[in-house]
């Protein structure tokens, strides 16, 4: 196996071991394994050799290997620098051109087995050795060994043996191997490098891990980790290799055998066990690791003093195994590793010298009689009281162990309930637990009583209190007695009772309520047996208790209200009013977490609230106990908050209220029995005694009792209300007034104090103080007056019958057509309505006023009387009144509708004021008999005119129900455009036909002379003969007719005579005809030919004329369409100008309040309307464009049909086809522009609506956004204006093209298009080639990168390993080859990228890629510069660089310079692209010149066609002239160099094809080069299969 392959294997191993790591922490500041860089540890290191030539000087000869050849001999002199070969040359810089070497004495001096030579290399520090390499200047030894020491004072361990006689020399098997499980630190022996050849430059490389089974599990193999560790390397040279000629003892032969080594290299890393990324020299110039991971030592082989929490370990790829700090709780900075502690706890750091009175492996505990303070920082002295404590040691909180009855942290005082501290402790107090706090005076023993308790031992209630209860924090309950007594006691016969709601069957009457008292439904769950409330917002919702929990709950004072409650979400926001009680005009509330309750959560919890006024139960506001009891006595509401956040729910269950009731059971001792003062009765003094009443009945039982007072009209009164049982027509609480219907002073005290009132129906009355007049005060409804003798306002009648019979007062009936708040709506006597409203009138407002109509009695005001609103033009005498029922106005003749505002069908002129006039439309000439309501113009059939559609239009005829037909008289053949009634035109002389569009016999049409011209005289003879024959035929016909019509009988003889006569006549005619035929036969033949020719030419010219006429008509229509489109565009532009002007005038002001945004609404509405109008305009433009497209299509089809088969005018068809396509394209563009205008109009409308929507949401208004929107709309309007200008220009271009009607031949341009298509195809191929080239470039760059990596490895190898000369030369030979291949591939890739396509855009792309390549080259150059700088530094540190490496660097620099040419070549390609663009422009100019030439030829052809159309007689010479002119035109066309220009274009296209082919070829070459690079890559070995062996010396 080659040395190079072995080194690659080691490179792979180093990469797998992350050997190139530079940092000991990763990007997340986490520790990771790190190692120093891979170096040649032997470089410039001192080697001690046990034998060296030159002392004294001696001669040695160079071994040639050929017997009998004169040997080349030299002198080795240690004193001469030029001739010495000391051990210093073993580790210097190896230069193949000027080699240096160490050399031993020759065999002549006794250097041969068993004598051996040792070469000892001291590394100065332990290294992880990867390989040891020796490069021999002579032939390699027959036997030598490599040893190593793991420490500077350790034993030598054999590394590897090399021998041609392994068993004989080293007692080792030749090429042995190590099996799994065997000792992997044994040295092996091999004969692989023991041949005598080569005689010069042989390499021997030993890989320390090769052949070791655990090499691929190196991180977990301590054996191999120790195996590769070395501080010293020794090479022992045991036996020289010879040819056997030494047996002759020839001095010259013996002088040719010696040891010589030119390079001694040791590859490895400074050993830092994965905890350092570099080794540095310390203050003693000794090489040590710059340790990280809290490690130290020369090899980072121990943890720092305070980092011993786990045992030191070597870092691995999976675990950096950094040393961890000891946990001394901040009490020590010293620790050591305790293996036992580590095995027991997993933490081995044992702290030393703990501070702050602490102790333990982690300083985690305090010293005896010390405790740790609350902050945990230090330990404090316990300080226990010796009298009161049981021990001097306290607990972790500093509390001492106290004697009975003693308390305090230091046991220095008595506990509550104890007193008199002594050696025996404290004595207990004798306090009543129900009335005391269980504490007493520590000196006297007097008990501390609860708030409402008294006595030395707190065993009795204070005055005004009762029921000494241990559960009562105040001890005793205050007497209530409705505040009428302060003396009470516990009542007998009452037991404990609970009012509950368990919600087992329903919600039991519980309700939900918000703060605004609005009701919220309560949800009851039968499955969970609970009720719930759900909120949508943060406003709270309360559960409201039903009646059974309310009213008199006085017996619940001091007792508990209990409930189970949970919430849906945990984010509850509590308040001060979570539980609310209301009653007797009082209101108290408490938070849910008051009185020691927990915070509500998603789990059900029990909440307990004591109904008491003490401050321990913080009901707010704070009220006295009497008020709290008063509240409970008349409890009107219990509310429990159910929701505490938005979108949440609260769940309530098991509500109970403790109270008391009479009956057996657990005694309720909190029920009072009062001792009442005089005037009071009842258990709670809640009643007044006989003869007493409430002084303030509204206070009910809280009112004091006083004696009854009835002003002498009663002896008794109601004890609760104080109401007297009044007599003598008196009334009132104390009989202090007369009852209704009576008057007088009841306080006098006599039985006649009150008298009856003089009023009807028992009405009440009063006495006027000044006049003592009795006045009725409560008259019956509808009456008024002192004695109720008058009808009230709004009523009528005669209640006293003063004006006739008695009539009771009744309400006036006005059909709800009066103002009920008005006064005097009707007459009080008759009931007539006086103030009718809603346009009504009448006694009872039961009809509409004049000029109004409708139902005055309608219940709905809108259905009552409405104004007539008669039309003044259509109403009789311009009346304003109408039918009050139907609203119909009186209409003039032939006027209709309710308001007389329209004419009948077939009538008009409503504004005349005299009625409508009949249209009188002609039933034949009009469409429907109707006319314009203002002008009276009838709707006419096509071609019909006149106000009544009674006649045909000018130049029309055939008046009928379908309209009039156009005369369509030929303008040249008719005297006028108007025809006769039968449609026949008035013809000019020589013209015939209904349209005067044909010449009569013996007349012909000549385009050069107006009108039909008479044929030559020769045609007159023919015409005369024809007329004679026609006359004879006519005579014959007349004869036959006369025979049929005659009444006379013709005899057979006469008939035969006449028949013979006729036959004779016919034969004469036949003979004359035959004679004429013979005479004029030649003339007829010639005439027939001429006529045939003329007919063909005439038909052809007529077809052309029709085509031109149709084309002109189509062009006119298209021009009209274009004109219409221009008008629409102008209109759109005007509208846009208006829109821009309106937008520019927009001044959006911020309203000072949130007022009405009507102005902005109007603006948005106007913008929306404008956008809709633009949309309509765009639709119209689109329609016109479509019509123009259809027109162009129709024109194209007509022209194509007319010119089909005409070879000479095929160019015309092509040009018209082109025109059609251009018109179609323009129409499509117009449609697109219209669609764009349409879309922009819609977008403007949408934005306007959006502005409107935004404005309607004011306030606030973001003026900045509005200004931006306005500016944006302005910009869009400006863009739209530009778009319209562009569209107008396109329309102008189209119009000019249509006006020109030039039939230009574009064959050249068509061929140019074909060439363009070919070029497009070529460009497509170029694009495909570009894609392939880019992919190839990508692969080439990837291969380049891989080769560059290999090059870097080789460079690093050459710099640091300094292999033997043969391998180095081989590597150097391969490096230029690889670089040359890479450079060539990159150069071709660059050329392919730069040359793909001949367009400027492709050249720009190529230039960009060239710049990128230049950047890559610059990067490579920078890397090379750095390498060069490193080399220069190495040169300064040592002696000089190897010239071969310089040569390699020169080759790399040349490659970089070659890459720099890339940009220049890309610029050249840019210039070539520009030239190609210029060529394309020249081709376009040539095409234009060809177009001009074709146009000129076309004009000539048109002139010839014109001459053909002006033939006045057949002239063969003229036809020959035309033929010659046509040939001249063809020659002229041929002289226009069209063929040459076409050939030039073809040549350009062929050149482009050649360029593309060249690019394809280059791409194929690039692919081949890439394949070659891949082959080179694949030939690099991936492993080393040497099996070296070592043995101990």
Swiss-Prot record:
- List where the protein spans the membrane: none
What's the superkingdom here? Answer: Eukaryota
Instruction: Note the coiled coil stretches, chain numbering.
Output: 1021-1580
Task: Give the subcellular location.
Answer: Secreted, Extracellular space, Extracellular matrix, Basement membrane
Residues of the signal peptide:
1-19
Chief location of this protein?
secreted
Q: Which InterPro entries match?
A: EGF-like_dom, Laminin/Netrin_ECM, Laminin_IV, Laminin_N, LE_dom, LMN_ATRN_NET-like_EGF
Q: Which GO terms describe its biological process?
A: animal organ morphogenesis; axon guidance; brain development; brain morphogenesis; cell adhesion; detection of light stimulus involved in visual perception; eye development; muscle organ development
Query: PROSITE patterns per the record?
Result: EGF_1, EGF_2, EGF_LAM_1, EGF_LAM_2, LAMININ_IVA, LAMININ_NTER
Cystine links in this protein are: 270-279, 272-289, 291-300, 303-323, 326-335, 328-351, 354-363, 366-379, 382-394, 384-400, 402-411, 414-426, 429-440, 431-447, 449-458, 461-476, 708-717, 710-724, 726-735, 738-754, 757-765, 759-776, 779-788, 791-809, 812-826, 814-833, 836-845, 848-865, 868-882, 870-889, 891-900, 903-916, 919-931, 921-938, 940-949, 952-964, 967-979, 969-985, 987-996, 999-1012
Positions of the UniProt region annotated as Domain II and I: 1014-1593
Domain Laminin N-terminal: start-end pairs: 30-269
User: Keyword annotations for this protein?
Assistant: Basement membrane, Cell adhesion, Coiled coil, Disulfide bond, Extracellular matrix, Glycoprotein, Laminin EGF-like domain, Repeat, Secreted, Signal
Residues in domain Laminin EGF-like?
270-325, 326-381, 382-428, 429-478, 708-756, 757-811, 812-867, 868-918, 919-966, 967-1014
Which CDD domains does the UniProt record give?
EGF_Lam (cd00055)
The Laminin IV type A domain, residue ranges: 505-673
Glycan attachment residues as annotated in the record:
44, 118, 560, 634, 654, 1006, 1091, 1159, 1189, 1207, 1254, 1364, 1379
The protein's job, in short, is: Binding to cells via a high affinity receptor, laminin is thought to mediate the attachment, migration and organization of cells into tissues during embryonic development by interacting with other extracellular matrix components.
Q: How does it assemble?
A: Laminin is a complex glycoprotein, consisting of three different polypeptide chains (alpha, beta, gamma), which are bound to each other by disulfide bonds into a cross-shaped molecule comprising one long and three short arms with globules at each end.
Name of this protein: Laminin subunit gamma-1
Annotated source species: Danio rerio (Zebrafish)
Please state the gene responsible for encoding this protein.
lamc1
């Amino acid at each position: 196996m080659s040395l190079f392959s072995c080194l690659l294997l080691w490179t792979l191993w180093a990469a797998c071991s992350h050997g190139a790591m530079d940092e000991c922490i990763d990007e997340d500041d986490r520790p990771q394994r790190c190692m120093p860089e891979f170096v040649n540890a032997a470089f410039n290191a001192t080697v001690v050799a046990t034998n060296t030539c030159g002392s004294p000087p001696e001669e040695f000869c160079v071994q040639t290997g050929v017997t009998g050849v004169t040997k080349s001999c030299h002198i080795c002199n240690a004193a001469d620098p030029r001739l010495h070969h000391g051990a210093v040359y073993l580790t210097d810089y190896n230069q193949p051109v000027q080699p240096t070497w160490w050399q031993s004495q020759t065999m002549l001096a006794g250097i041969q087995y068993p004598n051996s030579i040792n070469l000892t290399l001291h590394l100065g520090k332990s290294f992880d050795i990867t390989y040891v390499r020796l490069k021999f200047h002579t032939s390699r030894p027959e036997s030598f060994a490599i040893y190593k020491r793991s420490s500077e004072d350790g034993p030598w361990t054999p590394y590897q043996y090399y021998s041609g006689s392994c068993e004989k020399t080293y007692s080792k098997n030749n090429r042995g191997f190590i099996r799994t499980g065997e000792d992997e630190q044994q040295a092996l022996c091999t004969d692989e490098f023991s041949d005598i050849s080569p005689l010069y430059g042989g390499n021997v490389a030993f890989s320390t891990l090769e052949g070791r089974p655990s090499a691929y599990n190196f991180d977990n193999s301590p054996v191999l980790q120790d195996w590769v560790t070395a501080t010293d390397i020794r090479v022992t040279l045991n036996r020289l290799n010879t040819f056997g000629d030494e047996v002759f003892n020839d001095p010259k032969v013996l002088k040719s055998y010696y040891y010589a080594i030119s390079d001694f290299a040791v590859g490895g890393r400074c050993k830092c066990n994965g905890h350092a990324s570099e080794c540095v020299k310390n203050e003693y110039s000794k090489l040590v690791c710059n340790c990280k991971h809290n490690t130290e030592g020369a090899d980072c082989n121990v943890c720092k003093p305070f980092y011993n929490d786990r045992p030191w370990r070597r870092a691995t790829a999976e675990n950096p195994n950094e040393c961890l700090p000891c946990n001394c709780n901040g009490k020590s900075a010293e620790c050591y590793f305790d293996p036992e502690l580590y095995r027991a706890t997993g933490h081995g750091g044992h702290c030393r010298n703990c501070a702050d009175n602490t102790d333990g492996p982690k300083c985690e505990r305090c010293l005896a009689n010390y405790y740790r303070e609350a902050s945990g920082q230090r330990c404090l002295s316990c300080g226990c009281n010796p009298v009161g404590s049981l021990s001097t040691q306290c607990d972790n909180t500093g509390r001492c162990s106290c004697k009975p009855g003693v308390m305090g942290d230091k046991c220095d005082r008595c506990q509550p309930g104890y007193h008199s501290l002594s050696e025996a402790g404290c004595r207990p107090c004798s306090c009543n637990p129900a009335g005391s706090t269980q504490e007493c005076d520590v000196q006297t023993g007097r008990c501390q009583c609860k708030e409402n308790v008294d006595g030395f031992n707190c065993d009795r209630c204070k005055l005004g209190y009762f029921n000494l209860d241990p559960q009562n924090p105040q001890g005793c309950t205050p007497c209530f007695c409705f505040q009428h007594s302060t003396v009470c006691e516990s009542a007998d016969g009452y037991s404990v009772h609970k009012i509950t709601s368990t919600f087992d069957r329903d919600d039991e009457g519980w309700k939900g309520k918000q703060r605004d008292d609005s009701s919220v439904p309560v949800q009851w769950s039968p499955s969970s047996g609970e009720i719930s409330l759900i909120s949508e917002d943060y406003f709270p919702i309360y559960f409201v208790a039903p009646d059974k929990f309310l009213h008199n709950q006085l017996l619940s004072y001091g007792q508990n209200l209990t409930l189970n409650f949970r919430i849906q979400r945990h984010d509850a926001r509590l308040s001060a009013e979570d539980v609310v009680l209301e009653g007797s005009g009082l209101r108290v509330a408490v938070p849910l977490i008051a009185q020691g309750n927990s915070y509500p959560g998603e789990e059900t919890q029990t909440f307990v609230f004591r109904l008491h006024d003490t401050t321990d139960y913080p009901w707010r506001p704070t009220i006295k106990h009497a008020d709290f009891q008063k509240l409970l006595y008349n409890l009107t509401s219990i509310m429990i908050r159910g929701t505490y956040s938005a979108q949440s729910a609260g769940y309530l269950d098991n509500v109970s209220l403790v109270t008391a009731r009479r009956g057996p059971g657990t005694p309720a001792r909190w029920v009072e029995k009062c001792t009442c003062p005089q005037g009071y009765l009842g258990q709670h003094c809640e009643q007044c005694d006989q003869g007493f009443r409430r002084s303030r009945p509204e206070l009910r039982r809280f009112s004091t009792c006083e004696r009854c007072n009835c002003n002498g009209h009663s002896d008794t009164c109601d004890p609760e209300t104080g109401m007297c049982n009044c007599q003598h027509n008196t009334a009132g609480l104390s009989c202090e007034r007369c009852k209704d219907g009576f008057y007088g002073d009841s306080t006098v005290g006599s039985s006649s104090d009150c008298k009856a009132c003089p009023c009807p129906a028992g009405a009440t009355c009063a006495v006027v103080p000044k006049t003592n007049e009795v006045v009725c005060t409560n008259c019956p409804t509808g009456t008024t007056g002192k004695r109720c003798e008058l009808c009230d306002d709004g009523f009528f009648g005669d209640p006293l019958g003063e004006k006739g019979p008695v009539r009771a007062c009744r309400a006036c009936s006005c059909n709800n057509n009066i103002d009920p708040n008005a006064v005097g709506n009707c007459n009080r006597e008759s009931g007539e309505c006086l103030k009718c409203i809603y346009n009504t009138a009448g006694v009872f407002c039961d009809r509409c006023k004049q000029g109004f109509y409708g139902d005055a009695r309608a219940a709905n005001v809108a259905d009552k009387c409405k104004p007539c609103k008669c039309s003044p033009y259509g109403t009789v005498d311009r009346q304003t009144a109408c039918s009050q029922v139907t609203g119909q106005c009186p209409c003039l003749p032939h006027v209709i509708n309710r308001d007389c505002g329209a004419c009948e069908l077939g009538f008009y002129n409503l504004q005349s004021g005299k009625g409508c006039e009949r249209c009188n439309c002609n039933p034949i000439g009009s469409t429907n008999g109707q006319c314009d309501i203002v002008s009276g113009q009838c709707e006419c059939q096509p071609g019909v005119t006149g106000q009544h559609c009674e006649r045909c239009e000018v130049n029309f005829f055939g008046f009928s129900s379908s309209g009039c037909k156009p005369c369509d008289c030929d303008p040249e053949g008719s005297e006028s455009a108007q025809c006769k009634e039968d449609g026949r035109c008035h013809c000019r002389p020589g013209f015939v036909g209904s349209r005067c569009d044909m010449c009569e016999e013996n007349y012909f049409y000549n385009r050069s002379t107006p009108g039909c011209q008479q044929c030559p005289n020769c045609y007159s003879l023919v015409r005369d003969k024809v007329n004679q024959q026609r006359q004879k035929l006519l005579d014959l016909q007349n004869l036959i007719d006369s025979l049929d019509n005659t009444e006379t009988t013709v005899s057979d003889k006469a008939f035969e005579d006449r028949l013979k006569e006729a036959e004779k006549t016919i034969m004469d005619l036949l003979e004359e005809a035959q004679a004429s035929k013979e005479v004029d036969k030649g003339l007829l033949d010639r005439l027939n030919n001429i006529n045939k020719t003329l007919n063909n030419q005439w038909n052809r010219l007529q077809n052309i004329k029709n085509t031109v006429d149709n084309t002109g008509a189509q062009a006119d229509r298209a021009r009209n369409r274009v004109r219409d489109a221009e008008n629409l565009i102008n209109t759109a532009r005007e509208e846009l100008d208006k829109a821009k002007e309106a937008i520019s005038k927009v001044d959006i002001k911020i309203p000072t309040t949130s007022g009405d945004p009507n102005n902005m609404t109007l603006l948005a509405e106007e913008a929306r309307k404008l956008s809709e109008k633009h949309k309509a305009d765009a639709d119209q433009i689109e329609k016109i464009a479509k019509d123009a497209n259809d027109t162009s299509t129709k024109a194209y089809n007509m022209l194509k049909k007319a010119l089909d088969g005409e070879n000479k005018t095929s160019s015309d068809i092509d040009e018209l086809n082109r025109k059609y396509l251009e018109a179609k394209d323009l129409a499509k563009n117009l449609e697109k522009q219209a669609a764009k205008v349409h879309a922009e109009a819609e977008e403007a409308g949408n934005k306007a609506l959006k502005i409107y929507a935004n404005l309607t949401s004011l306030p606030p208004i973001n003026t900045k956004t509005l200004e931006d929107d306005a500016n944006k709309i302005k910009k869009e309007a400006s863009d739209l204006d530009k778009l319209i200008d562009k569209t107008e220009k396109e329309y102008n271009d189209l119009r000019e093209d249509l006006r020109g009607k030039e039939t230009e031949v574009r064959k050249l341009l068509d061929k140019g298009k074909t060439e363009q298509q070919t070029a497009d195809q070529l460009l497509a191929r170029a694009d495909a080639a570009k894609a392939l080239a880019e992919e190839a470039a990508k692969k080439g760059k990837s291969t380049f990168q891989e080769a560059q990596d290999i090059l870097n490895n080789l460079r690093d190898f050459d710099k640091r390993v300094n292999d033997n000369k043969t391998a180095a030369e081989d590597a150097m030979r391969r490096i230029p080859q690889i670089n040359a291949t890479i450079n060539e591939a990159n150069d071709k890739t660059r050329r392919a990228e730069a040359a793909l396509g001949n367009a400027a855009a492709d050249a720009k792309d190529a230039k960009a890629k060239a710049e990128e390549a230049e950047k890559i080259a610059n990067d490579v150059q920078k890397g090379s510069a750095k390498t060069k700088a490193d080399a220069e530094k190495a040169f300064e540190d040592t002696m000089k660089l190897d010239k071969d490496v310089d040569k390699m660097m020169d080759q790399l620099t040349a490659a970089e310079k070659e890459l720099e040419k890339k940009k220049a070549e890309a610029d050249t390609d840019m210039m070539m692209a520009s030239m190609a663009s210029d060529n394309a422009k020249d081709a376009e100019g040539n095409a234009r010149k060809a177009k001009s030439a074709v146009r000129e030829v076309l004009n000539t052809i048109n002139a010839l066609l014109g001459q053909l159309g002006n033939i006045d007689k057949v002239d063969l010479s003229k036809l020959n002239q035309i033929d010659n002119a046509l040939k001249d035109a063809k020659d002229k066309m041929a002289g226009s160099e069209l063929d040459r220009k076409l050939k030039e274009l073809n040549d350009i296209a062929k050149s482009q094809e050649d360029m593309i082919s060249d690019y394809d070829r280059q791409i194929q070459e690039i692919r081949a080069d890439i394949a070659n690079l891949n082959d080179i890559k694949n030939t690099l070995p991936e492993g080393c299969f040497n099996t070296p062996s070592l043995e101990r010396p």
